[in-house]
Design a protein with these regions (language model features):
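Binding-cleft/active-site segments that stabilize strongly anionic ligands or cofactors
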Residues: 137-183
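Hydrophobic, ordered structural segments
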Residues: 16-70, 175-183
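Glycine-rich, highly charged phosphate/nucleotide-binding loops
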Residues: 4-18, 154
Length: 196
């Protein structure tokens, strides 16, 4: 960012040091993480190392909220995200609703990064959330294929079994960098072969 935009952005330690130097007493941290995972754990560990320098420290949940123990655990955060991403995806694909897309034979696959962290159950929870909202043509996949049931080949099987002929790929990522670009810019023949 600095080289491109001539804008300096602190890393976490620099930001924490600056907060201490500036005399911050009550630190509130709003992470930009999608879910609990290795990066969220690293962030909380770093912040915990500074707790004695503040009167209070509060760390907010990531976008998808608490993890829970299994795929059935959903929450209001996951529901809000599921509704927002499906509403946006429908509109951008030219459909009035997910039901209208389903009637047209179109499924939406929302691709996350994937992780070997125990929080990977979050992806299965998002699939459960989609199903609980009645979104039968919404599927959750991961680039890394972790958890295994979110691997591309597994998601393709689910889409085929459900009878959808068209697929709209969407990132389920806060920062949609190289992974999202590689998904969205898959060539037409490759996209066709994934579903055929």
């Amino acid at each position: 960012v600095e080289a491109r935009d001539d804008e300096v952005i602190d890393n976490m330690q620099q930001a924490l040091d600056r907060a201490v130097e500036n005399g911050v007493k009550n630190l509130v941290v709003q992470p930009t993480h999608l879910m609990h995972g290795a990066e969220y754990d690293e962030m909380t560990e770093a912040i915990n190392g500074y707790k004695d320098k503040f009167e209070s420290v509060a760390i907010a949940e990531p976008m998808l909220g608490e993890v829970g123990d299994d795929a059935t655990v959903i929450n209001d955060d996951k529901k809000a995200v599921a509704q927002a991403i499906t509403d946006t995806a429908c509109k951008e694909a030219g459909f009035d609703s997910m039901d209208a897309a389903a009637e047209a034979g179109t499924a939406f696959v929302f691709m996350g990064h994937g992780t070997s962290h125990t929080a990977n159950v979050t992806y299965d929870q998002m699939q459960t959330q989609m199903e609980n909202l009645g979104l039968k043509n919404a599927f959750i996949g991961t680039v890394e294929g972790k958890p295994e049931d979110t691997a591309c080949d597994k998601v393709i099987e689910k889409v085929k079994e459900a009878g959808y002929k068209n697929v709209v790929l969407r990132p389920l990522m806060v920062v949609a960098g190289d992974h999202a670009l590689s998904l969205i810019h898959i060539s037409e023949p490759t996209r066709h072969s994934l579903i055929s």
